[in-house]
From Swiss-Prot:
Superkingdom of the organism of origin: Bacteria
Keyword Nuclease: yes
GO MF terms, alphabetically ordered: DNA binding; DNA endonuclease activity; metal ion binding
Known partners and oligomeric status: Homodimer, forms a heterotetramer with a Cas2 homodimer.
Disulfide bonds: none
A Pfam family it matches: Cas_Cas1
GO terms for biological process, alphabetical: defense response to virus; maintenance of CRISPR repeat elements
Function: CRISPR (clustered regularly interspaced short palindromic repeat), is an adaptive immune system that provides protection against mobile genetic elements (viruses, transposable elements and conjugative plasmids). CRISPR clusters contain spacers, sequences complementary to antecedent mobile elements, and target invading nucleic acids. CRISPR clusters are transcribed and processed into CRISPR RNA (crRNA). Acts as a dsDNA endonuclease. Involved in the integration of spacer DNA into the CRISPR cassette.
Annotated binding of Mn(2+), by residue: E143, H206, E221
The protein, known as: CRISPR-associated endonuclease Cas1
Cofactor: Mg(2+); Mn(2+)
InterPro entries per the UniProt record, alphabetical: CRISPR-assoc_Cas1, CRISPR-assoc_Cas1_C, CRISPR-assoc_Cas1_HMARI/TNEAP, CRISPR-assoc_Cas1_N
Length: 316
């Protein structure tokens, strides 16, 4: 398994013989392509079609984020592993209202269970509400209601004010951290989807759209409590992130370069941290947890096994 690379400095990324080269006025670094799983870009980067063709041939996605750290898009290589049969099953589960609702509920249940683990808030009432919902809007409303409780708890445990969730744009440091963490999680889940036969545009909780890979939004719901909420709490409580790591421009608050690097380092370390996975009777990385979740989803779509979302607390 290759590594995830993060580019935080302006420069040029190119193909150099049979490897990758990043260079600018201060540095020239060759990166063995066999060591690269995917690349996250947070700076101005010059590249050409020769590089893109090379990345495509190696199946390496390239994720782009703008100056403020918002996810803007992915160079998504042509899928090398496709399955018409699985695509048909994905669409069938979207078109069948009950099958779609089951999967949508599952993603929300996974989100609520993992939020319950992170914030130590009883979720029984909300899990029962989820089971009683009959539509996607009802379902999303229940999740949003529980999220509000969690955000109040987030303020308590960090001592930072959230006031209310603001996304476009984030208006304070806590909102900026949530938005940045969510963007990273969406992109990482998309990178893992690429390695499977799943089509990233067919989703169940979030409405499929011509302008986004909405399946990554669905699956990310299960992982955001661990990859975002839990990480934010730890970074603030350990004083690794403070108010000096943010900038504000035009009523928008965002992580500055130093803060972004701190968050990325912690995010990447979490991806590589291992945890015992009972079903396999061995430890796996948090990155592998995403892959295993996608395989469970595939088995459900193929009607080989009923999908049950990751309950992170149950792994402990």
């Amino acid at each position: 398994m290759g590594r995830v690379y993060y580019i935080n400095s302006h420069g040029t990324l190119s193909r150099h013989e049979n490897t990758l080269r990043f260079e600018n006025a201060e540095v020239k670094k060759d990166i063995p392509v066999e060591d690269v799983e995917e690349i996250f870009v947070f700076a101005e980067l010059s590249l050409n079609t020769k590089l893109l063709n090379f990345l495509a041939s190696k199946g390496i996605p390239l994720h782009f984020f703008n100056y403020y750290g918002y996810y803007t898009g992915t160079f998504y290589p042509r899928e090398s592993s496709v399955s018409g049969h699985l695509l048909i099953k994905q669409v069938e589960h979207y078109l069948d209202a009950q099958k779609r609702l089951y999967l949508a509920k599952s993603f929300v249940i996974g989100s609520i269970l993992n939020l319950e683990y992170v914030y130590k808030i009883s979720a029984d009432t909300y899990l029962n509400k989820v089971k009683e919902t009959n539509s996607i809007p009802e379902l999303m409303s229940v999740e949003a209601e529980f999220r509000k409780l969690c955000y109040k708890k987030l303020e308590e445990v960090t001592g930072w004010e959230l006031e209310k969730r603001t996304k476009r744009p984030p208006q304070n440091p806590l909102n900026a951290l949530i938005s940045f963490g969510n963007s990273l999680t969406y992109a990482k889940v998309l990178g893992e989807i690429y390695k499977t036969q799943l089509n990233p545009t067919v989703s169940y909780l979030h409405e499929p759209s011509t302008k986004r890979f909405s399946l990554s939004l669905d699956v990310a719901e299960v992982f955001k409590p661990i990859f975002v909420d839990n990480l934010i709490i730890r970074l603030i409580q350990e004083n690794k992130i403070d108010k000096t790591h943010f900038s504000t421009e035009l009523n928008m608050t965002f992580l500055n370069e130093i803060g972004r690097k701190v968050f990325l380092k912690a995010f990447n370390e979490l991806l590589e941290t291992t945890i015992f996975y009972p079903k396999l009777n061995r430890k796996v990385s948090h990155r592998t947890l995403i892959k295993l979740e996608l395989y469970k989803l595939i088995k459900h779509l193929l009607e080989e096994e009923v999908y049950l979302p990751l309950n992170y607390g149950g792994l402990k």
